[in-house]
């Protein structure tokens, strides 16, 4: 009996926590799909195109390989 009560309280708590921490409970998936569709129609609106990268001759990071073109060799983009 105690275990059943604990389980019911836990489920109610987790359900309330899920709704309380949701970003936008009203039409959340609709807004997500709408934004994705807009980015497909207008590729320049995509966040992926706003990638920060280094041009040739600039200092770079060997771990991230953050050169726009070429490779990061001896901390300089080639």
UniProtKB/Swiss-Prot annotation:
The keyword Secreted belongs to this UniProt entry's keyword annotation: yes
Keyword Signal found: yes
Cell compartment(s), UniProt: Secreted
Domain of life: Eukaryota
Pro-piece positions: 23-49
Signal peptide: 1-22
Record-annotated disulphide pairs: 53-68, 60-72, 67-77
GO molecular function: sodium channel inhibitor activity; toxin activity
Tissue occurrence: Expressed by the venom duct.
GO CC entries: extracellular region
InterPro entries (UniProt xref): Conotoxin, Conotoxin_d-typ_CS
Record keywords, A-Z: Cleavage on pair of basic residues, Disulfide bond, Ion channel impairing toxin, Knottin, Neurotoxin, Secreted, Signal, Toxin, Voltage-gated sodium channel impairing toxin
Main location: secreted
Family: Belongs to the conotoxin O1 superfamily.
UniProt comment concerning the protein's domains: The presence of a 'disulfide through disulfide knot' structurally defines this protein as a knottin. The cysteine framework is VI/VII (C-C-CC-C-C).
Function: Delta-conotoxins bind to site 6 of voltage-gated sodium channels (Nav) and inhibit the inactivation process.
Descriptive protein name: Delta-conotoxin-like Ai6.1
Species annotation: Conus ammiralis (Admiral cone)
